[in-house]
């Protein structure tokens, strides 16, 4: 009888790994008769499961236990183990030059990677996201966003601004297949992003919005997204403060980013953008901290004049010299990194 009860308890907790359980619930779920020896005998079984590291007491002496998720060792050098190549993610291009953002040649993207894009409000996050979508359209990417759709009569439809941008980009991007069906999937998602990730696909999220008192949750949100990617990758846009050195969420964002890019204003023209390579876990050249400038044209659809820039050697990035606007950098604080 005791062994039979033990088997029942083990089978039950096996089904609820990662959750919590208490003695009373176990008795109820297993329909144990209060007058039977099993009523108290279940405590012996629980004690045994604690010793076997199947259950863990809460520590509050309240009879609550966490069911520990069981794992098996992973053999690394298994005969015939496949070596997966880098993920062939195409970065946005300079429309006029036809070349991908030059730093992308020095970044290695792997399956399951997460690219975060921290951008100041109205500084081109959507432009970068849509260009990622366009460059990888033949891989049938997934696009989620809180400004791409609008609710009309109980049904989500593409927002006017979004479809206008796609119409402009259709001059150089084939958004549909031969049968007229979308070559990408648009999901009207504004929360619970991880639950809607499409495994083994490029998932582009523009953008994740969290309340100010929830920014510490961003690490968990990004971790959950990564866990669902399979052999796909994610590109996630996040808001960034004007003078901050990272996306909102700070270190929590950096902890889970395989590549971290930042977007700021470059000049008094709101369509001039400064891109900083803040982080990259796998790279083939020293690119961290490098900065690039470009302009956005044609209603936020094209990236042009993409080039590397460095801090102005005359004003040291301060935009002014001797109380006057710096002529060398035209009051941007930056200068094109021209080859010698």
Descriptions of predicted regions:
Residues 36-48:
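Short amphipathic alpha-helical interaction segments
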Residues 117-118, 122, 216-314, 318, ...:
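Phosphate-binding/switch region of NTP-binding enzymes
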Residues 50-60:
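A short, conserved structural fragment
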Residues 18-33:
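Short acidic, hydrophobic short linear motifs in intrinsically disordered regions
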Residues 60-81:
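Short, cationic-aromatic polyanion-contact patches
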Residues 74-103:
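N-terminal pre-Walker A segment at the start of P-loop NTPase domains
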Residues 128:
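Hydrophobic positions on the alpha1 helix immediately C-terminal to the Walker A/P-loop
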Residues 4-7, 16-17, 105-110, 119-120, ...:
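Conserved inter-motif catalytic segment of the P-loop NTP-binding fold
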